[in-house]
């Protein structure tokens, strides 16, 4: 090899990479979080705050259930908070989930590349185990993170308890409605049975109710005013048909069996059942 060529090769400066060629871009977590916070359609759940220098998760429950799965492969809010901590985000409000990072600003996506993920620094070989142990478990770094994670877990537990209470209240309300419907059905069936066995029962109750209504109308208005009825329920039609009334008109006007009539009818039915039971016992 020519000595002159080798000397020239040694004197040449090393190649310089083009500026920005090897520059790493922002992490997918940061870009997805930036897009998520900037979506105007979900500002009621998560949005920018303080003029765009911080962001707030207004509704953590809806955030975990609807937004996180769209951007990440999980719906765990505490895991999302831990990720923010690893990238240097700080929780700046005690009463709400508001986070801040100097490189995470509204409308400045290019600053995301300045946010670096925290990594545990390796200890120098000269340090022994007792010297490196405090750096690996620095209370000043771990305790705030543990407090935030505990707060997240307590919030999730509180949300689950509230949902459980609402579910129990709904089940109890449904049970009451079902029991009420079953009780009313039993009364109706008992009444129909007694009406078949005693044809005069319905007519007597119907006439008593009519007499009381007429007396009340006379006392209040001084005359009898009959109101036209357009509809009869199936049960009312059945009861009238059993007594031969059908849909007959009295003086050209239909009469309606309202809820008060059926309540009175069922009360009389219950009283009659009690009287029969007493007679059987005697």
UniProtKB/Swiss-Prot annotation:
The hydrophobic-rich region (HR-A/B) corresponds to the oligomerization domain. AHA motif is a transcriptional activator element. The gene is HSFA7B. GO terms for biological process: response to heat. It comes from the Eukaryota. It is found in: Cytoplasm; Nucleus. Belongs to the HSF family. Class A subfamily. Exhibits temperature-dependent phosphorylation. One of its GO terms (cellular component) is nucleus. Residues 1-24, 117-139 are annotated as: Disordered. A motif (Nuclear export signal) lies at residues 232-240. Residues 26-120 bind DNA. The keyword Hydrolase does not apply. This is Heat stress transcription factor A-7b. Signal peptide: none annotated. It comes from Arabidopsis thaliana (Mouse-ear cress). Keywords: Activator, Cytoplasm, DNA-binding, Nucleus, Phosphoprotein, Stress response, Transcription, Transcription regulation. Homotrimer. Pfam families: HSF_DNA-bind (PF00447). Residues 1-11, 120-134 have a biased composition (Low complexity). A motif (AHA) lies at residues 259-268. A motif (Nuclear localization signal) lies at residues 208-212.
């Amino acid at each position: 090899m020519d000595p002159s060529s080798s000397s020239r090769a040694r004197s040449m400066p090393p190649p310089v990479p083009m500026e920005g060629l090897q520059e790493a871009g922002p992490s997918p977590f940061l870009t997805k979080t930036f897009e998520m916070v900037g979506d105007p359609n979900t500002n009621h759940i998560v949005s920018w705050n303080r003029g765009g220098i911080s962001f707030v998760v207004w509704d953590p429950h809806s955030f975990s259930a609807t937004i996180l799965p769209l951007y990440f492969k999980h719906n765990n809010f505490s895991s999302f908070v831990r990720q923010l901590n690893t990238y240097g985000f700080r929780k700046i409000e005690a009463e709400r989930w508001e986070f801040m990072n100097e490189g995470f600003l509204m409308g400045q996506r290019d600053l995301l590349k300045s946010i670096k993920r925290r990594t545990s620094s390796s200890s120098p070989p000269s340090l022994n185990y007792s010297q490196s142990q405090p750096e690996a478990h620095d209370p000043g770094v771990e305790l705030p993170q543990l407090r935030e994670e505990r707060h997240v877990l307590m919030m999730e537990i509180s949300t689950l308890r509230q949902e459980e209470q609402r579910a129990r209240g709904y089940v109890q309300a449904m049970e009451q409605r079902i029991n009420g419907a079953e009780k009313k059905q039993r009364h109706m069936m008992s009444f129909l049975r007694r009406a078949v066995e005693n044809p005069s029962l319905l007519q007597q109750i119907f006439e008593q109710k009519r007499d009381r209504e007429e007396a009340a109308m006379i006392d209040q208005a001084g005359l009898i005013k009959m109101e036209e009825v357009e509809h009869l329920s199936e049960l009312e039609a059945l009861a009238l048909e059993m007594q031969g009334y059908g849909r007959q008109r009295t003086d050209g006007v239909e009469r309606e069996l309202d809820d008060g009539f059926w309540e009175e009818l069922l009360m009389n039915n219950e009283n009659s059942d009690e009287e029969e039971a007493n007679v059987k016992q005697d």
